[in-house]
Design a protein with these regions (language model features):
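Helix-biased detector of long, well-ordered alpha-helical tracts
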Residues: 2-232
Length: 232
């Protein structure tokens, strides 16, 4: 048996990252929108998305990226699934706060433009948005040879729910039924550690063939009847 692996040994200090995020949040200015106004922030404890007021509704925003899974996908020539990962990471976060995903925009950064790569990304993003029933409303493509050394892909999703309809977990009580949805495999979290642990490229190919799945179709009935999100 080799030495146990953790995030720190793979190059990611999650404790330092948590401190950095706390410093960022502490430096952000409060909203210029007062409660009751369009765009006023809505506090949702433990929420996976940013929420604002919008009349009788609330809008929810989530942003996330594919991360270091892109590095592996590029090396083994399997970029066809990363669009699914990008869309799923965002729409699944919206579902966690009780929002119905409506629209998605992507951000692609590359050191050098490659029509074949962009075509593969565009096709998978489009397919994923169709499956998740969200509109692919646009995006940004940046060629940044002086800043970006490898492909980076991220996105932002917009959703909505009626005011008062968000998932807060406030009504949880003993005896409630906990429903677990099966995972299709390793999605897009923890691939820096995966890369450090797994060195057999055949196994990596098999892992990459599993695409992240938007939870929308299986989750909406549950959400309509009330729910709470637990991630682990």
């Amino acid at each position: 048996m080799g030495e146990p692996m953790d995030y720190a040994s793979s190059g990611v200090d999650i404790d330092l990252e948590a401190k950095a995020v706390a410093s960022l949040i502490g430096s952000l200015a409060s909203s210029s929108r007062a409660p009751g106004e369009f765009g006023a922030p809505v506090h949702l404890p433990g929420g996976f998305g940013g929420i604002i007021e919008f009349g009788d509704s609330c809008l929810a925003l989530a942003t996330d990226g594919v991360g270091s899974k892109l590095q592996i996908a590029s090396k083994v020539g399997q970029l066809g699934g990363v669009g699914f990962d990008c869309v799923a990471m965002n729409v699944n976060d919206l579902i966690c706060v009780g929002a119905e995903p409506l629209a998605f925009v992507d951000y692609i950064a590359v050191p050098e433009a490659d029509p074949e790569v962009h075509s593969s990304l565009g096709e998978s993003l489009s397919q994923a948005c169709n499956i998740a029933r969200v509109t692919l409303a646009g995006g940004e493509t940046a060629t940044l040879p002086g800043i970006v050394k490898e492909l980076d892909l991220s996105g932002t999703a917009l959703g909505w729910f009626p005011k008062g309809g968000g998932i807060t977990g406030e009504n949880l009580e003993e005896g409630d039924v906990l429903i677990g949805l099966p995972s299709s495999g390793i999605h897009s979290n923890g691939f820096t550690l995966v890369r450090a642990v797994i060195e057999v490229w055949l196994l990596i190919r098999r892992l990459l063939s599993v695409r992240s799945k938007p939870r929308l179709q299986r989750s909406q009935k549950i959400l309509r009847e009330g729910g709470s999100h637990n991630s682990g």
